[in-house]
Amino acid sequence: MSSKKAINIIVATSTNYGIGYDNKMCWHIPEELKHFKRITTSCDDKKKRNCVIMGKNTWYSLPKRPLVDRINIIISSADYEKISCEVSDCKDNIKVFKNIEDAFAYVEENEEIESAFIIGGAQLYNECLDKYVYKIKYMYMTIVYDKKYECNKFVAADVIFNNFKFEKKDVYNSELKYITMKGYNKGISYPRDEPAD
């Protein structure tokens, strides 16, 4: 059964679907970061906020933490206590859970949250694609193709393209550096007149 709220994945990859090297992004494209912020902060209901869900390595890799104007959810079983103590003074904006199931339950129960975005890293992306693809409504995907990047963390592209439909109207090509695409989960029914983001 799919979620009542929109749970989405947003990911940027190289042309061979790498997402980073040793827990660091391999590119820095300000326009793409603005796209990420716009997608993850936009709410139809101005009284609500979105949340971003990430693993601990993604959390620690953020230059500025937490990501503003969003509830930040960190998933870590091994370092749950440590991270919980580190963020104890930001309980309104940061939540820590031991597993993704608890995070999904929190999203469903929290009336302040409009949509959720899974933002990495590779382990969390691939766990969600493997076990919870039926919950994922939209796939926001950026492919960076300005040059070849060396990556050692990858996302399961075969699962993405087998389960999400990307339409031409939802593809944007940005000055020969990257393309952004919005994919619709083939297993979820929803109005097709929704505007592209």
What are these regions (language model features)?
Residues S2-D197:
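Enzymes that bind and transform nitrogen-containing heteroaromatic metabolites
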